[in-house]
Amino acid sequence: MAWVQLRLNSTNEKAEKISEYLEEIGAVSVTFMDSQDTPIFEPLPGETRLWGNTDVIALFDAETNMQQIVRLLQQKNHLDENTAYKIEQIEDKDWEREWMDNFHPMKFGKRLWICPSWREIPDENAINVMLDPGLAFGTGTHPTTALCLEWLDSLDLTGKTVIDFGCGSGILAIAALKLGAKSAVGIDIDPQAILASYNNAEQNGVAERLQLFLSEEKPTDLQADVVIANILAGPLKELYPIISNLVKPQGDLGLSGILSTQADSVCEAYQGKFTLDPITEREEWCRITGKLNSFV
């Protein structure tokens, strides 16, 4: 069967609404790509997409009147004269198989692997987290998630407590538990993230050691030995009083979701209470880690 593809550029704020409308008017699938043509495959809702602009790609039956589709988008103000778009015929493929073929087991640090459920585990003796990609954020494909996973792998988490602030898919909390943490807490503003984290924890056999809270429902006295927050620079600075108070004395803090150009301003917010390590960078993103000062 032949297909026709519509590709248009959008802001992150509009991409979800455009996707929903495209499905309403007949798209058989809608996917997102970042500006480097990298699929934004992430496992279930729960975290903020970190790309500034997103290409929305819709697949239609070849018989679809694409000019009518364009007119409908224009009528809904999803497409205007300043929006670039492209329509093209594409060859028939096994799209589900091609999607699955994009994902392979990934290694982070010395011990940790993230593996889709349909792939063979590369190393039975390693720490293996089974996680299937969906359309949210947090499988390890983004540099910030990778940086966080590598940091967790570098720590001795044996018997430690961990808080994953902005847990999304739960990937960081689950990885920490598999790496030896005694217990973990996941916190998020999105109920779907809480559900996704629980389901992923169950799949990995660690659900009984993971507590999950919506942000407004977390205990007021909650603290942990290790706190990790992979969100965005703005919220990290705004939520500094809350995040910093989650760390136990002499505890470890890891922050990501930060562009390298934003690192100094985030460090400035946290350096009064934490002794910070050298910043770790990857592509245009970075990770900030440190230890709570004993005199605080």
Curated annotation (Swiss-Prot):
InterPro entries: Ribosomal_L11_MeTrfase_PrmA, Ribosomal_PrmA_MeTrfase, SAM-dependent_MTases_sf
Listed EC numbers: 2.1.1.-
Alphabetical UniProt keywords: Cytoplasm, Methyltransferase, S-adenosyl-L-methionine, Transferase
Principal cellular location given in the protein's record: cytoplasm
Cystines in this chain: none
Residues at which S-adenosyl-L-methionine binds: 145, 166, 188, 230
Residues that span the membrane, as ranges: none
GO MF annotations, alphabetized: protein-lysine N-methyltransferase activity
Catalytic activity: L-lysyl-[protein] + 3 S-adenosyl-L-methionine = N(6),N(6),N(6)-trimethyl-L-lysyl-[protein] + 3 S-adenosyl-L-homocysteine + 3 H(+)
Keyword Methyltransferase among UniProt keywords: yes
Location within or outside the cell: Cytoplasm
A single Gene Ontology CC term: cytosol
GO biological process: methylation
UniProt record similarity statement: Belongs to the methyltransferase superfamily. PrmA family.
Task of the protein: Methylates ribosomal protein L11.
Protein name: Ribosomal protein L11 methyltransferase
Organism from which the protein derives: Histophilus somni (strain 129Pt) (Haemophilus somnus)
Gene designation per UniProt: prmA
